[in-house]
């Protein structure tokens, strides 16, 4: 083979290899987009607007459009008390579902606060409470939610409340499983804000449709009365509690109250918590972190915007 032909073949081979290398690489834009894509989507908890709702300035039916049009959020988390007599009102639910479909807004979950205690040691009361929750599982299914959020509150020792809670969650989760709806517990004061206690409940129930909803700031296990009112005397560590709850979490509630001049939450390290969420989440996690502004310094609208901006900033810097 002469030298000219040998050189030609060598150059063709090098060019082909180079093309193969570069063809296999994503473009710069793809790399940039992949690096910046957050692992979670933002939803809005209706409680963020509780003062507006309670004043009558808006209704539950208005909530999805406000989330989308005022805040650019296309996923919502309802609170049952703002449509508490509508769980089995098919016409109402059809209208709500139609509006969210027209808006391209996702119905994520329903927070249930008015259906009774699931941790009460009174068997008759507990059975009634369980039955009251069934309608919300059905409503959640109709709306396309992934879960209902429930509470574990009651009077008794931690052991007594645990026994009642396991019974309630076991029965509710079976019903939820039949309907494809999760039953998730929030740390919402009292013994439910003890992460270790709540995780033990999850282990005993042992149903994939029974899970948790870690809230960034609901960690007061017990209160004490002082001269100026009530103060928390036993505060569970929010970072430990979130880490403990995340393996069972189907969602996360990003509670916020007060912001500094830089836009960070004064008492809650969002970056640290969201790193925990990312590290400890499992396949149970449905992908949403819900804004729940509960402060009094900013207006509800401004508090929601500040929390959204903070979540977006954290996501971009992870």
Give the positions of each predicted feature.
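Hydrophobic residues in well-ordered beta-strands that form the structural core
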Residues: 44, 107-109, 149, 185, ...
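N-terminal pre-domain/capping segments
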Residues: 2-142, 160-163, 177, 196, ...
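Active-site groove signature of glycoside hydrolases
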Residues: 140-160, 179, 184-191, 290
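Active-site loop/turn elements of alpha/beta-hydrolase fold enzymes
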Residues: 78-81, 112, 150-153, 188, ...
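Hydrophobic residues within beta-strands of alpha/beta enzymes
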Residues: 76, 108-110, 148, 252, ...
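Active-site clefts of carbohydrate-active enzymes
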Residues: 254-262, 286-298
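A short helix->loop->beta-strand "cap" motif at the edges of active sites that frequently abuts
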Residues: 105, 181, 280-287
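Acidic/histidine-rich catalytic cores of soluble enzymes
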Residues: 75-76, 170-276
């Amino acid at each position: 083979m002469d030298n000219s032909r040998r050189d030609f073949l060598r150059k063709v081979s090098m060019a082909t290899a180079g093309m193969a290398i570069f063809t296999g690489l994503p473009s710069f834009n793809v790399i940039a987009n992949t690096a910046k894509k957050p692992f979670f989507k933002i939803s809005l908890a209706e409680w963020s607007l509780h003062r507006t709702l309670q004043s009558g300035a808006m209704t539950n039916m208005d909530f999805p459009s406000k989330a989308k049009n005022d805040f650019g959020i296309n996923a919502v988390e309802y609170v049952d008390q703002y449509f508490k007599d509508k769980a089995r009102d098919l016409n109402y639910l059809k209208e709500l579902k139609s509006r969210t479909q027209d808006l391209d807004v996702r119905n994520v979950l329903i927070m249930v606060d008015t259906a009774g205690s699931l941790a009460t040691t009174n068997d008759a009361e507990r059975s009634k409470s369980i039955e009251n929750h069934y309608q919300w599982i059905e409503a959640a299914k109709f709306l396309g939610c992934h879960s209902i959020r429930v509470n574990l509150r009651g009077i008794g020792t931690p052991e007594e409340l645990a026994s009642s809670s396991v019974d309630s969650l076991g029965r509710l989760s079976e019903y939820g499983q039949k309907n494809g709806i999760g039953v998730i517990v929030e740390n919402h004061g009292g013994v439910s804000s003890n992460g270790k206690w709540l995780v033990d409940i999850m282990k005993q129930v042992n149903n994939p449709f029974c899970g948790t909803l870690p809230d960034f700031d609901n960690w007061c296990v017990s209160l004490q009365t002082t001269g100026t009112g009530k103060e928390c005397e036993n505060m569970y560590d929010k970072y430990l509690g979130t880490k403990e709850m995340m393996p069972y979490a189907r969602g996360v509630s990003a509670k916020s109250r007060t912001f500094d001049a830089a836009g960070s939450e004064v008492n809650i390290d969002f970056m640290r918590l969201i790193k925990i969420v990312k590290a400890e989440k499992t396949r149970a996690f449905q992908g949403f972190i819900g804004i729940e502004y509960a402060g009094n310094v900013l207006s509800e609208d401004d508090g929601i915007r500040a929390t959204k901006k903070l979540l977006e900033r954290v996501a971009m810097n992870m």
